[in-house]
Amino acid sequence: YLRTKDGGDDVAWYVWLTSGTVSETPPLDQFTNLVWSDEYNENGALDSNKWVHEVGDSWFNNEVQSYTSRLDNSKVEDGKLKIIAKKESYNGNNYTSARIISNTKKDFTYGRVDIKAKIPGKKGTWPALWLLGSNFKTITWPACGEIDILEAAQSNNFRVQSTVHHPDNYGGGDTNI
């Protein structure tokens, strides 16, 4: 998601997920069976078989935008997913952006995630890529678990970090990796 106060940049997201048979301690080379991917080959709207837009006012981290499913805020173009934050009046907010999830389309237990992303470094942005437990609506956060693959909040001087959230450490703290 993006949090913006002064507009934003295009963000390119590429996601590949792979999986394999898991032993107690799987070797890294074991996860070579591609089980899900989106190469963003079709210009226009996202593949609705893989992605869902969460729309409405920002309700997670005090963002100041409305999330939309409009092509103005997210589209596939030239092999990239572009998430676009815009300064505009919409549903009582002064900014729009897109929040895109896959949890209603595909669940993963083990595997490797490969992502290539270009993230903005502008004032007011908070680009992030997360893995969130698919049961978050029934057991709530942080009991469902969350792995922040990448977060680069402007409020943290754009320091890129990864964090593991769990019931004993919902703020991350010493579980930063």
Describe the residue ranges of each PLM region.
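Short, aromatic- and glycine-rich surface loops/edge beta-strands on solvent-exposed regions
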Residues: 1-4
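Edge beta-strands of jelly-roll/beta-sandwich modules across compartments, strongly enriched
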Residues: 8-20
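GH16 jelly-roll
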Residues: 23-177
